[in-house]
Design a protein with these regions (language model features):
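N-terminal targeting or regulatory segments adjacent to alpha/beta-hydrolase or S9 domains
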Residues: 5, 13-82
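C-terminal catalytic histidine-bearing segment of alpha/beta-hydrolase fold enzymes
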Residues: 293-342
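Conserved alpha/beta-hydrolase "acid-adjacent" motif
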Residues: 285-291
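N-terminal cap/lid segment of alpha/beta-hydrolase-fold proteins
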Residues: 61-109
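Short beta-strand/loop motif that positions the catalytic acidic residue
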Residues: 277-280, 284
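Mobile cap/lid helix-loop segments that gate and shape the active-site cleft of serine hydrolases
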Residues: 127, 226-269
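Short substrate-entry loop that stabilizes the transition state in hydrolases
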Residues: 107-112, 117-159, 229-230
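Alpha/beta-hydrolase active-site loop
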Residues: 166-186
Length: 342
């Protein structure tokens, strides 16, 4: 099914580089004990103290832009309604940073559905800051979900980046599958209602994790996803040099490594009942829309549940239709959510 949605007015893109990502560590059993440290996301104190910290780190102009985008009443509402933690968790012997956000008031059943959010970018670029949570994570948690997000390995420190580097969808996929297992076992999480959301490169992490995890994932949503690295290289040839840095044995096994990270090459290996929502802008200059359309054709051929939503006039970040994208995602997840007694 392909739906063409109408855009809203284009919103101002703000790149927020503040906050404190979480830390993490490894384990074979993936229980709550794999969270080795956690800290309150709002530990900076008041809204004014947060703004003062932003000014000191990013300068006056950027702090004013962030103040405009995230007003004090929004900060206060999230602080009142959400339990937000910067965490460090264990993943195969590595310490990995992340975020864990839950509604403070829970659900009448005592169990809440879970979303694992898979970010875009590589290494430190695209890492989720506290300010990013306002756009990407808090709205999902306010809608009644436990939301966990990984920074992926290699983001703890320069030493960590050298000893456990980002592989752009290689061994680092285990950071997602381990986080899924950890958060599904936390008190208040509903292990029967697990979902994933991937943005840009996060699509690679989402689909590889979906193929490899033993946990039942009910549905996934992908924003501006990378579905085929061959198409990405055709669109952005400079990525060839980046892949040589990030992907082990890239020059010797180039096609095999690209195929491994390209869901268009193995759609039949995905769980047949997991619903796939794809949201893309038709002016995306970073991730090719044609890959999403190719993947949609394959899912249709296989008879899999899916939906492709294309927003006219929208770029990679979908800023002009963010409320619509959020609503479309929640509607999709609700469609596949298991209710008590089902």
């Amino acid at each position: 099914m392909i739906t063409i949605a109408r855009p809203l007015l284009l919103a101002l893109l703000l790149s927020c580089s503040v906050g404190h990502p979480a830390s993490a560590a490894p384990s074979s059993r993936s229980t709550a004990s794999d969270i080795v440290s956690e800290a309150d996301c709002f530990s900076m104190g008041s809204y004014d103290q947060w703004m003062a910290g932003l000014r000191a780190k990013n300068g006056l102009l950027k702090s004013l832009l962030i103040r405009w985008k995230f007003p004090e009443d929004e900060f206060t509402r999230h602080r009142r309604n959400l339990d937000c933690r910067a965490i460090t968790y264990r993943s195969d012997g590595h310490l990995v940073r992340g975020w864990l956000v839950r509604p403070k008031h829970g659900a009448s059943t005592g169990k809440l559905p879970v979303i694992v959010y898979n970010r875009g970018g590589n290494r430190g670029y695209g890492a989720l800051t506290f300010a990013h949570l306002f756009t990407h994570v808090f709205p999902l948690a306010e809608s009644g979900y436990v939301v966990a997000a990984s920074q992926y390995r290699g983001v703890m420190s320069a030493q960590d980046a050298a000893s456990s580097p980002d592989q752009f969808g290689g061994d680092d996929v285990r950071d997602v599958t381990n986080l899924l297992r950890i958060v599904s076992r936390l008190p208040g999480s509903d292990p029967d209602n697990l979902f994933m959301l991937g943005q840009s490169r996060g699509a690679i992490m989402t689909f590889r994790a979906l193929r490899e995890t033993t946990l039942p994932i009910r549905a996934v949503a992908i924003y501006s996803g990378v579905y085929d690295l061959h198409d990405l290289l055709a669109m952005r040839p400079a990525f060839d040099g980046l892949f040589e840095v990030l992907i082990p044995d890239y020059r010797r096994h180039r096609k095999a490594e690209l195929d491994k990270r390209s869901v268009t090459r193995w759609p039949g290996q995905l769980p047949p009942r997991t619903g796939v929502l794809m949201i893309h802008g038709d002016e995306d200059e970073r991730a090719p829309l044609r890959s999403a359309r190719t993947f949609a054709v394959e899912l249709d051929r296989l008879g899999r549940p899916y939906k492709l939503v294309v927003h006219p006039g929208e770029s990679h970040f979908l800023d002009g239709v963010r409320p619509e994208v959020h609503a479309q995602t929640l509607q999709w997840f609700e469609r596949f959510r298991q209710r008590p007694g089902q």
